[in-house]
């Protein structure tokens, strides 16, 4: 198994993440927040930080998901998304490991499928951490 990406500065609740979501006049961040809250709710071991301008969720210091806003969409992303089962076909991306789901205003979201991906990413990083010991 390859070395896990680590963010040692991840904390239980990062004030910079809260400030990022609180930016005035940024509707896309308000659209992203419920998905980050879902990541936070995965377990008591979830930590967070602002990494590369994205609200990032970790188990301990190992990231599993993030939300990021762009000009016209939100990405709900997964650091090891390539390993996730995606029967609804939501995941996009061509990178070595990462995948994301793009959300746009006015377009429907498959809420159960995206919730399943978040839960699967959390379980996946916990397995990776356990096997890295």
Language-model features: locations:
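Charge-dense, helix-prone N-terminal extensions
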Residues: 1-133
